[in-house]
């Protein structure tokens, strides 16, 4: 039985007792500043075989949503800081399986979060899909996200969901230092991310992307863990080393592979995608900090349902699907991120998530996006 049928018939877990799609109204959301893209259901996307057997979590029967039900709609509007190339196929499948008209406004995570804050109660968004916990926390802090059902939250380990039950991680991503293996020896990578500063070995050989949401979340983590002065000094120090500025992580990875730079600060999965596309070994590796260093931050891409959603039941059904085995396998196998649903294994080329020993940091503490943006502006990086 397809997941859409479970919803319509009031089947298992979170879907029990929902009057979701059978009695939906088709009211359009209010006008949006930038028209979202409608994901055409029917494209279809079947995940490839899992590297190893993966068991789906068992939902709690009879769980009911804690989001207030309003006039419901089969149209769900998502503000997505995740790119269309990464999650478009998955959202197409979800729309098809759930019988939803999924409309997506793609953009920069921080900019979309700001747009939601500016739109306030007029926002047409039902669901925010951010590429980092910082933006989700910023929306939660401003009261824009509704509490999520415990049944959904409990599918994800506690470190990767909101301590206030306002957002939930969908996939994990790890900050790494990518380096060119033909020009850099592994032992040359500093023992801490902060030790790059003042090291002339790296002058004009580093790459970073200060406008990237994941980088900004890392800066927030550095502020929380080491303080404002250390974070400012690190930014100023890397800038003083004439680090090359890139628009995004993928550009840093490509430049490292090509030998244009020797190392850069990125998320782990970009190199794996380049390898998959190339179909051959590449002269680059990821250095994982496994000593609790801020440079080894494990962040999440996650979702939250807006308090103003006019389709909150449908939005929750979408979250339910994102935390199902098929969707989690998609993230493991197609985007090379860490699945967060218990029983679904990461790609075999990745170190196990439990072995990474990330910094002891509550991801809910990454909510001061405004402070990080202000700091980046002050040091001339924005």
Annotate each PLM feature.
Residues 176-183, 298-311, 330:
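A bilobed periplasmic-binding-protein/Venus flytrap-type ligand-binding module shared by bacterial periplasmic
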Residues 73, 80-88, 107-111, 117, ...:
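Extracytoplasmic ligand-binding site segments that recognize negatively charged/polar headgroups
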Residues 247-308, 342-348:
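Extracytoplasmic/periplasmic substrate-binding proteins
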Residues 204-209, 321-344:
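Periplasmic-binding protein-like
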Residues 5-25:
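N-terminal export signals
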Residues 229-231, 337-382:
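An extracytoplasmic/periplasmic, membrane-proximal ligand-sensing/linker region
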Residues 67, 77-101, 177:
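Short, polar/charged alpha-helical segment
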